[in-house]
Amino acid sequence: YSHGYEKSLIVQDFIPGDDSHMRVLTCYSDQNGKVKMMCLGHVLLEEHTPKGIGNHAAIITEYDEEVMTKFKNFLESINYTGFSNFDIKYDTRDNSYKVFEINLRQGRSNYYVTGSGNNIAKYVVEDRVENKELELKIQKEPFFWRVIPRSVVYKFVKNQDLVNQCKKLASEGKEATSFGYKYDLSGNIKRSWYIFLYSINQIRKFNKYCK
């Protein structure tokens, strides 16, 4: 204010903890305001470049009935329709979850939802075009999504239990990457080369910025 700013200012409490304290919840509410899909992600790593900081880079889906019930009740109480995406952080000071915001859309890292078996396009078409009555789908099984090489996840995630879970899911084929669509890569040398260079660049970026 000493520099002449006169408008209101919001001061937000800083929640301690590294990337793995973050959670992301994506939901779909039908045209009647009823939640029909919920997928909670445990963020493992975020991007750390100056321009990309905060974007999710690796996620494991998880099930937390208490947390998901609270969000379901909230969305239905305001008769919300469409996609919703919540940024959440676990606060070790009082062992509670703190909600930063609700995005009125699917998130940038939304392929963690699709990859785990929840096709968001299908929900929209069946609800809005075909007017079907949808069943509630809550993602319960763990699934590993990433947009960076596995080696980066294994190196920079500090919680070894989470790293071991990633390795187990990868070995079981319960894993997806946003750049791993086989129909894009099959016979497409240029695209495959681009993904290879992208992966090398991600390794370089994390080594430089993620300390």
Protein language model annotation of sequence segments:
Residues 2-18:
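ATP-grasp fold ATP-binding core
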Residues 12-13, 81-93:
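A short glycine-rich, hydrophobically flanked beta-strand micro-motif that places a catalytic Asp/Glu
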Residues 13-79, 103-128:
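ATP-dependent carboxylate/phosphate-activation module, predominantly the ATP-grasp catalytic core
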Residues 95-105:
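A short beta-strand motif that forms the metal-chelation/ATP-contact edge
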Residues 126-211:
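Peripheral (often C-terminal) accessory segments that flank ATP-dependent C-N-forming ligase machineries
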